C-alpha cells in the first residue's frame, strides 16, 4: 500500500493545484494579452528614466547572490553564489554554469561548481558537478523513520543547512571532494546517449558523538553501518564509470515552460578504480512541464521524480542516496540536506508556477508539495512503507528575461521542520 499512497499523494497535489489554476484562467488571458516581458534591470532603468537596454539574443547573463548565515556546526558563514547563462555559437538552447564559494568562522570551506552545456546545434551535452568541502553536517540514521530513540525538536534550516542542534542528531566533520562529469551525444532530436566518470571522496571523517571507551560507549549509525559492511570509518570513496541516456525536449534548460527531461544512469564502481568493494547502482530522473495557459505559458505545472536504487551494504554510509543530494541540492524543500538516507530512495514533487505581475511578468510565484521515501533493511523498513511530505511557497523575480533566469526565494515546511531558500534559477 505504501507505493499507492506515494502516487496518490503526488497526483492529489498536482490535481489540487491544477484545479485552482483553471479557476483563474479566464481572468488572466485578457490581462496577459499585449504585454511585454520585463526583468529586474528594466524596472531599475525605468525608475531611473533610462530606456530599456537592448541585449543581443543569446548574450550571456550573470546573476550573483550574497550568502550569509549561521548554524552551530559551521558558525557564521559568508560567501557568494550565482549563475552564468549563455548560448554557445550555433546552439538553440541556453547553457549554464552555477556555483558558490563560502567560508565560515570555524575554518570551513565550501566550493561548488556545476555545468550544463550544449554545443553547436545541440549535438553534445555536457553535465558536471564539482565540489570541495571542509565541512560539518549532522546525520540522522537510515530510513524515513529516523532517527531512532525519539522525535526531533522542531528544525530550522537555511539553504538546506541545519541551524539548530538536537540531542538525537549525529554530527560529523569531514573533507569532501566530488568530480561528476558526463558527456552525451545527440542520437536524434531530444535523445542523447553517452558516458561519464563519478568520484565522491570523504576524508578525515570525525564522528563527533562516537564513544568507544569501555563503560562510556555510544555507537552511531555511521559507525555501525561501516563496521557491519566492512567500510573504513574515517575515509572512503566511490569511483565509478557511468552510462547515461537522456531525453530532453525542454524549451529552456534554466526555466522551462514546456517539455520533458528524462535521464537514466547506470553507475559502476569497480575495485580497480579504488573502491573498497565492487558496486553497481541505478538512478533515474524525470522532470516535465505542462503549460496551463495559451496566452501566458508561465502558468504551468512542473513535476519532478527521482529514484536511486542500490544494494544494501554496497555503498559507504555518506555516499548513500539522501535528500538534497541532487545536482542543485534542491530536493525535499522543508527538510535539511541529508535528513533522510537509505540504500534506495524515491522522491517526487509537484509545483505550480504562476505570474504575479499581470503584465510585466517581473514577479512570479510558486506553490509546491513533495514526498520522500527511503528504506532501512536492518530495521525491516521497506521503500514506500514510510513517506515524509513537504510543502511550501515562493517568490520569483525575473532577473534576466532573455535566459529566463529567476531569483528564487522559497519557504518550505516538512514534518516538524522549516527551511528558507535563496537561489538563482528554478529548483528543477
PLM segments and residue spans:
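C-terminal hydrophobic structural anchor segments
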Residues: 353-390
Amino acid at each position: 500500500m505504501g507505493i499507492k499512497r506515494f502516487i496518490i499523494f503526488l497526483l492529489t497535489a498536482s490535481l489540487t493545484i491544477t484545479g485552482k489554476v483553471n479557476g483563474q484562467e479566464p481572468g488572466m488571458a485578457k490581462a496577459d494579452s499585449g504585454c511585454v516581458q520585463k526583468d529586474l534591470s528594466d524596472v531599475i532603468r525605468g525608475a531611473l528614466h533610462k530606456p530599456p537596454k537592448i541585449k543581443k539574443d543569446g548574450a550571456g547573463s550573470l546573476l550573483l547572490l550574497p550568502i550569509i548565515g549561521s548554524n552551530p556546526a559551521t558558525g557564521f558563514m559568508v560567501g557568494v553564489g550565482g549563475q552564468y547563462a549563455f548560448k554557445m555559437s550555433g546552439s538553440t538552447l541556453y547553457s549554464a554554469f552555477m556555483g558558490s564559494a563560502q567560508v565560515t568562522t570555524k575554518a570551513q570551506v565550501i566550493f561548488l561548481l556545476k555545468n550544463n552545456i550544449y554545443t553547436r546545434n545541440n549535438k553534445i551535452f555536457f553535465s558536471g558537478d564539482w565540489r570541495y568541502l571542509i565541512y560539518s553536517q549532522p546525520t540522522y540514521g537510515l530510513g524515513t523513520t529516523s532517527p531512532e530513540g525519539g522525535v526531533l525538536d522542531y528544525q530550522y534550516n537555511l539553504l538546506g543547512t541545519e541551524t539548530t542542534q538536537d540531542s538525537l542528531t549525529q554530527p560529523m566533520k569531514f573533507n569532501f571532494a566530488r568530480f561528476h562529469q558526463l558527456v552525451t551525444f545527440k542520437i536524434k532530436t531530444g535523445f542523447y546517449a553517452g558516458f561519464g566518470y563519478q568520484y565522491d571522496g570523504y576524508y578525515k571523517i570525525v564522528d563527533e558523538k562516537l564513544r568507544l571507551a569501555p563503560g562510556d560507549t555510544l555507537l552511531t549509525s555511521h559507525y555501525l553501518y561501516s563496521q557491519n559492511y566492512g567500510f573504513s570509518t574515517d575515509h572512503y570513496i566511490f569511483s565509478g564509470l557511468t552510462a547515461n541516456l537522456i531525453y530532453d525536449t525542454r524549451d529552456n534548460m534554466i526555466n522551462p515552460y514546456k517539455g520533458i527531461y528524462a535521464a537514466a544512469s547506470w553507475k559502476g564502481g569497480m575495485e580497480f578504480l579504488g573502491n573498497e568493494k565492487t558496486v553497481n547502482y541505478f538512478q533515474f530522473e524525470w522532470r516535465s512541464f505542462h503549460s496551463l495557459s495559451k496566452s501566458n505559458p508561465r502558468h504551468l505545472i512542473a513535476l519532478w521524480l527521482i529514484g536511486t536504487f542500490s544494494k544494501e551494504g554496497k555503498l559507504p554510509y555518506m555516499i548513500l542516496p539522501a535528500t538534497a543530494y541532487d545536482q542543485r541540492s534542491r530536493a525535499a524543500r522543508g527538510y535539511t540536506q541529508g535528513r533522510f538516507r537509505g540504500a534506495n530512495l524515491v522522491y517526487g514533487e509537484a509545483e505550480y508556477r504562476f505570474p504575479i505581475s499581470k503584465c510585466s511578468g517581473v514577479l512570479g510565484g510558486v506553490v509546491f508539495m513533495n514526498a520522500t521515501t527511503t528504506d532501512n533493511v536492518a530495521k525491516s523498513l521497506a521503500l514506500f512503507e514510510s513517506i515524509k511530505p513537504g510543502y511550501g511557497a515562493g517568490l520569483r523575480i525575473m532577473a534576466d528575461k532573455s535566459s529566463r533566469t529567476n531569483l528564487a526565494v522559497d519557504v518550505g515546511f516538512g514534518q516538524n521542520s522549516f527551511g528558507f531558500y535563496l537561489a538563482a534559477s528554478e529548483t528543477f
